UniProtKB/Swiss-Prot annotation:
This is Mannitol-1-phosphate 5-dehydrogenase. Coiled coil: none annotated. SUPFAM superfamilies: 6-phosphogluconate dehydrogenase C-terminal domain-like (SSF48179), NAD(P)-binding Rossmann-fold domains (SSF51735). It comes from the Bacteria. The gene is mtlD. GO terms for cellular component: cytosol. One of its GO terms (biological process) is mannitol catabolic process. Pfam families: Mannitol_dh, Mannitol_dh_C. It catalyses: D-mannitol 1-phosphate + NAD(+) = beta-D-fructose 6-phosphate + NADH + H(+). GO terms for molecular function: mannitol-1-phosphate 5-dehydrogenase activity. InterPro entries: 6-PGluconate_DH-like_C_sf, 6PGD_dom2, Mannitol_1_phos_5_DH, Mannitol_DH, Mannitol_DH_C, Mannitol_DH_CS, Mannitol_DH_N, NAD(P)-bd_dom_sf. The keyword Oxidoreductase applies. Its EC number is 1.1.1.17. Belongs to the mannitol dehydrogenase family.
C-alpha cells in the first residue's frame, strides 16, 4: 500500500486531504500535537466524513494512524523517510514550525539512500505555500541535504478549496464537509510526476487558479463574515439571507472578476458562473459556518499580499474599480471578537495609535492615496 504523511489532523486535514488520499489508496499517517485526536486515530484506525447536502451521504476513511510530533518526533522522521507523498493543512502561520522536522526527515532519506522522488504539498490558503515551506526547510538542511532535496524532493504549490466549518461532535474524528472540493497542483515543480492523484487537477501554471480561488472564495467568504458581523449575523448563511449583505458580496466579486479577467484572461461567463457557485456554497443550508470562524485573524487577512489588499493594489494599478473591497477592509478593521486574539490586538492598536499608522502597520502599504482611502472607511 502507498504511504502518505499528512501534517494537520484537523477538520480540513481529515475532511478534505485525508479523503482524497484515502480514495487514492494511501495509508495516512496524520501528524499533529492534539493528543486526543492522535489517540483516537490510533485506537480506531478509521473515521467518517459526512457530505453536507440533501441525503447527507457518509464516507468511511480507513488505514489511518496518528503521530504526536511533539512527543514522538522520531516517529515522524521515520515516516518521512519511507513515505510516498507529504501534504499539510495546518495554516500558513504554522508552516515554519514543521520545517525542522521535515528537514530531519529529508536528511534521513538521504542517509538511508532513499532516492525515490517525493513531493511535499502545502495545502494552505496562501499563494506559493509549498515554496514558502521549502525556504523554511532549507534553513535546517546540511549542504548535502540541500543537494539531495534539489534532486529528489519537490515542493509543488497547490490550491485547495473546500468549506469545512468549525464543528463539535461526540465522535472527535467525525467531520462534516460541503460537497464541493477542488485541489489543483502545479506540474512544473513536481519531482514525482508519475504519482498522479485522482480527483486532483494538475496545471503547468498554478498562479491563475490560486488567485482565482483566493481572490474569489477567500475574499468573498471573508467579506460575508466581516459585513455579516457588522450587521449582527452569527453564521455565513444568516449573513447571505440579508439582501443588503448579499448584494455587497456580489459587488466585491464583480470587482474581483474584473481583475481576474484583465490579468489572466479568464472567460467572463465561466467566471460569473464560478462566482455564482461560490454564493450558492455560502448559502448551503446543511452547513453551520460561524462568522467567528471565517472572520478570525483579521490582522493576517489584512496583510499586503492577502485577500483584500493584494487585489486592491492590483485593481488600482489597472485603473479598475475597488471601492467595494475598500469598504470591506473598513469592516475588517472594525471587527472585534473577545475570543480572537488578533481582533483584540487590532482594537488595542487603534486605541493607542493613529488610524493611519495602524493601517500602514497592518497592511504594509506605502501608497498614500490607498492608505487615506482605507482610513476614510474605518
Amino acid at each position: 500500500m502507498k504511504h502518505s504523511v499528512h501534517f494537520g489532523a484537523g477538520n480540513i486535514g481529515r475532511g478534505f486531504i485525508g479523503e482524497i488520499l484515502f480514495k487514492n489508496g494511501f495509508h495516512i499517517d496524520f501528524v499533529d500535537v492534539n493528543n486526543q485526536i492522535i489517540h483516537a486515530l490510533n485506537e480506531k484506525g478509521k473515521y467518517e466524513i459526512e457530505i453536507a447536502q440533501k441525503g447527507q451521504s457518509r464516507i468511511e476513511v480507513t488505514n489511518v494512524a496518528g503521530i504526536n510530533s511533539k512527543e514522538h518526533p522520531e516517529q515522524v522522521i521515520e515516516a518521512i523517510q519511507k513515505t510516498d507523498i507529504i501534504t499539510t493543512a495546518i495554516g500558513p502561520n504554522i508552516l515554519p514550525f514543521i520545517a525542522e522536522l521535515l528537514a530531519k526527515g529529508i536528511e534521513a532519506r538521504r542517509v538511508a539512500g532513499n532516492t525515490q522522488a517525493l513531493d511535499v504539498m502545502a495545502c494552505e490558503n496562501m499563494i506559493g505555500g509549498s515554496q514558502f515551506l521549502y525556504q523554511e526547510v532549507k534553513k535546517y538542511l546540511s549542504p548535502e541535504g540541500l543537494t539531495f532535496a534539489d534532486n529528489y524532493i519537490g515542493f509543488p504549490n497547490a490550491a485547495v478549496d473546500r468549506i469545512v466549518p468549525t464543528q463539535s461532535h461526540e465522535d472527535s474524528l467525525f467531520v462534516m464537509v460541503e460537497p464541493f472540493n477542488e485541489w489543483v497542483v502545479e506540474t512544473k515543480r513536481l519531482k514525482n510526476p508519475d504519482l498522479r492523484l485522482e480527483d486532483v487537477h494538475y496545471e503547468e501554471d498554478l498562479e491563475p487558479f490560486i488567485e482565482r480561488k483566493l481572490f474569489s472564495v477567500n475574499s468573498g467568504h471573508a467579506t460575508s463574515a466581516y459585513i455579516g458581523a457588522h450587521y449582527g449575523a452569527k453564521t455565513i448563511l444568516e449573513a447571505l439571507q440579508n439582501p443588503n449583505i448579499k448584494s455587497r458580496i456580489e459587488s466585491v466579486l464583480a470587482e474581483i472578476r474584473s481583475l481576474l479577467i484583465a490579468k489572466w484572461n479568464f472567460d467572463k461567463k465561466e467566471l460569473e458562473n464560478y462566482h455564482k457557485v461560490i454564493i450558492e456554497r455560502f448559502e448551503n443550508p446543511f452547513i453551520v459556518d460561524e462568522v467567528s470562524r471565517v472572520a478570525r485573524t483579521p490582522i493576517r487577512k489584512l496583510g499586503y499580499n492577502e485577500r483584500f489588499i493584494r487585489p486592491i493594489r492590483e485593481l488600482k494599478e489597472l485603473s479598475l474599480s475597488y471601492k467595494n473591497l475598500l469598504k470591506t477592509v473598513g469592516y475588517a478593521f472594525d471587527y472585534r471578537d473577545v475570543n480572537d486574539e488578533e481582533s483584540i490586538r487590532l482594537g488595542e492598536l487603534l486605541a493607542k495609535q493613529s488610524v493611519k499608522d495602524v493601517v500602514i502597520q497592518v497592511t504594509g502599504l506605502d501608497d498614500q492615496e490607498l492608505i487615506e482611502r482605507i482610513v476614510e472607511y474605518i
